[in-house]
């Protein structure tokens, strides 16, 4: 017997969406596998919520193909897709109590009263609201309303749960709690979650896989660690966490020049003397006495952030460096910046994700 090829649960092939002359999505390709937590991460207006609307069927593409379980669904109505959406405003029915909100979907589908009751009780227990079934929506908190919205979506037994910035209206502490609860819920259920956010901390904390969206296209996709440690371009490096990005020249494999000096690094596969951008994260820099530093700097500014100090320093070539430090520094003081070769990440100018992956594979294969 021939072994079947495992197909993606959801696939975008060259998908575009235009509103007149405005190109909202530009030939997007992506694949979603079953049973993982995905995040569409990007700034406002980048196209991430549009991708969610295309998956759900609320919008239809003007070009390309959307496949769910291998079948083209470009014109398939929302109610015939095995997906459900939790919106930013939760979209709960204020005239119904918690129980009736969760029961709404199964009731519309014609489930028996017994099955509906079993489903509702099971879903409310899953989101830790089993004692809230008789409560009115106006009587529960924002975090509890968020859980009711999730329970209502899950009661329809979807293969995919779409979450459109559902945590953005919550306060910081509750948002952190809900991040953990959503991740735990996805792992327990084993279904696919696709989460939309502009908050990179949320994306890094919750996801198995991140699609970084900008200007209607996928800039980069990968695991949280890969995207943070190996950003493909200036936008990704700057958007995912804080980054020091300075111009440099790749002298040869594993040797880069920036700020007037040469430094060993762990990148390769570029042309000799190719112009590049150099990335070093603030947490990878240590402030030391000038003689121990690889770069000499002048402390320009600092601010206390509770668990650390954010220090701004200027090197002798005029580059500005952000440093995350446990101890304060004196403004105007001459200090050194210490870092290791593996802390330096090199980005080519205008490199595509395909070329980036190929280059990475080629020089990693030489090790």
UniProtKB/Swiss-Prot annotation:
Family statement drawn from the similarity comment of this UniProt entry: Belongs to the ABC transporter superfamily. Spermidine/putrescine importer (TC 3.A.1.11.1) family.
Molecular function GO labels: ABC-type polyamine transporter activity; ATP binding; ATP hydrolysis activity
Function of the protein: Part of the ABC transporter complex PotABCD involved in spermidine/putrescine import. Responsible for energy coupling to the transport system.
Subunit and interaction comment: The complex is composed of two ATP-binding proteins (PotA), two transmembrane proteins (PotB and PotC) and a solute-binding protein (PotD).
Name of protein: Spermidine/putrescine import ATP-binding protein PotA
Membrane protein topology class: Peripheral membrane protein
Gene name for this UniProt entry: potA
Compartment list: Cell membrane
Start and end residues of each ABC transporter domain: 10-240
Residues annotated for ATP binding in this entry: 42-49
Organism of origin: Oenococcus oeni (strain ATCC BAA-331 / PSU-1)
Catalytic activity: ATP + H2O + polyamine-[polyamine-binding protein]Side 1 = ADP + phosphate + polyamineSide 2 + [polyamine-binding protein]Side 1
């Amino acid at each position: 017997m021939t072994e079947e090829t495992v197909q993606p649960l959801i696939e975008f092939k060259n998908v575009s969406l235009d509103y007149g002359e405005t190109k909202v999505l530009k030939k997007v390709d992506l694949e979603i596998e079953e049973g993982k937590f995905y995040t569409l991460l990007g700034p406002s207006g980048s196209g991430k919520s549009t991708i969610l609307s295309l998956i759900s069927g609320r919008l239809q593409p003007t070009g390309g193909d959307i496949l769910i379980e291998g079948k083209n669904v470009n014109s398939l109505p929302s109610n015939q897709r095995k997906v459900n959406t939790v919106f930013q405003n939760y979209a709960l029915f204020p005239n119904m109590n918690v129980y009736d909100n969760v029961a709404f979907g199964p009731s519309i589908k014609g489930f028996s009263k017994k099955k509906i009751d079993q489903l509702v009780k099971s879903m409310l227990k899953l989101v830790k609201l089993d004692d809230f079934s008789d409560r009115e929506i106006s009587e529960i908190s924002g975090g509890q309303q968020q859980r009711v919205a999730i329970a209502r979506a899950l009661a329809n037994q979807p293969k995919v749960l779409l979450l459109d910035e559902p945590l953005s209206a919550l306060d910081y502490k509750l948002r952190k709690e809900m991040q953990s609860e959503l991740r735990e819920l996805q792992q327990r259920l084993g279904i696919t979650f696709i989460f939309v956010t502009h908050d990179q901390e949320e994306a890094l904390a919750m996801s198995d896989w991140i699609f970084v969206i900008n200007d209607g296209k996928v800039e980069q996709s990968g695991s949280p660690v890969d995207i943070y440690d190996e950003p493909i371009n200036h936008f990704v490096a700057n958007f995912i966490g804080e980054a020091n990005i300075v111009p440099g020249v790749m002298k040869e494999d594993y040797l880069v020049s920036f700020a007037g000096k040469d430094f060993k690094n762990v990148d390769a596969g570029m042309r000799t003397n190719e112009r590049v951008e150099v990335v070093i994260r603030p947490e990878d820099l240590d402030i030391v006495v000038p003689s121990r530093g690889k770069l000499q700097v002048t402390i320009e500014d600092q601010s206390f952030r509770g668990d650390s100090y954010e220090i701004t320093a200027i090197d002798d070539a005029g580059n500005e460096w952000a440093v995350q430090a446990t101890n304060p520094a004196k403004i105007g003081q001459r200090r050194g910046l210490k870092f290791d070769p593996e802390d330096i990440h090199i980005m080519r100018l205008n490199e595509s994700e395909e070329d980036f992956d190929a280059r990475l594979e080629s020089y990693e294969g030489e090790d």
